[in-house]
Amino acid sequence: MDKLYYMGIDVGSTTVKLYVEDQEHQCIYSKYQRHYSDVKPAIESLIKEVQEHYGNLPVKVVMTGSGGLSLSKHLNVEFVQEVIACTKTVETYIPECDVAIELGGEDAKITYFESTLEQRMNGTCAGGTGAFIDQMASLLQTDAAGLNELAKNYETIYPIASRRGVFVKTDIEPLTNEGADREDIDISIFQAVVNQTISGLACGKPIRGNIAFLGGPLHFLSELKAAFVRTLNLGEDAIISPSHSHLFAAVGAALHSDFNITTTLSALR
């Protein structure tokens, strides 16, 4: 019997994530990539990349994410809701998780894994998300990685409101005019994201136990994650940082593909 492979594709508001594993659940390929609102070519390029490396693999495919439903119909593959996909990954790989904090391009989520699953989500405003961080980085003439690098050497955290960028400028500009160090401004932006996420989503409900940090911003921006850890006063043993934390929905989609129709990479392009 030929080997089968399982592919999960997560289409978010700003990025696409692709994850492929074999029958032993070993990852053979994964990629996190911005799509710049041009989703189909981005996915096609990722599938082409897999095919160039591994040939025309037989695959079972499931899509997920905020932009995945219509595209799944176009490609004639199954779709699974993102919360279901992420929950599957958590239950499979980090069952000890009590709460997951996830930041995406234009949404933020806190999921409580208790006797009943409870997810709280901000999907209506970009404040406190990856898009907000990008906007602030652009305002300061850098990128998210640049913010992160400078934030490593901060000394003071200033109050900044993580709301719409046009309002945040009124907090940042006085700091700049008064000569505040860039390192301090950058960490203050990250702290604003933390405050917005915790106050806006948890709404007083305790975030405790083993905490997983998921999504691209928390995977790639070490100082943003560190700001969450400081604010929640977490010990090292309470922090869960999976190796594929930026791909969790795509991994969950792949895990859901067991019973789907088998196709090939070339048929998806």
Model segments located where?
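Glycine-rich phosphate-binding loop plus the immediately following alpha-helix
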Residues: S115-T156, R164, L255-F259
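Conserved phosphate-binding/catalytic loops in two-lobed NTP-binding clefts
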Residues: F79-V83, F228-V251
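Glycine-rich phosphate-binding loops at beta-strand->alpha-helix junctions
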Residues: G67, C203-T231, P242-H246
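Phosphate/pyrophosphate-binding loops at sites that engage ATP/ADP/AMP, CoA/4′-phosphopantetheine
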Residues: L46-V59, T197-G209
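Short beta-strand-loop/turn "lid" adjacent to the catalytic site in phosphate-handling enzymes
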Residues: Y32-H35, Q51-I84, T111-R120
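Short glycine-rich, Thr/Ser-proximal phosphate-binding strand/loop in the N-terminal lobe
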Residues: K3-P41, S45-K48, G123
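Glycine-rich phosphate-binding/hydrolytic loop that grips phosphoryl groups
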Residues: I133-D134, I240-R269
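Adenine-nucleotide phosphate-binding core of ATP-dependent small-molecule kinases
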Residues: V168-C203, H246
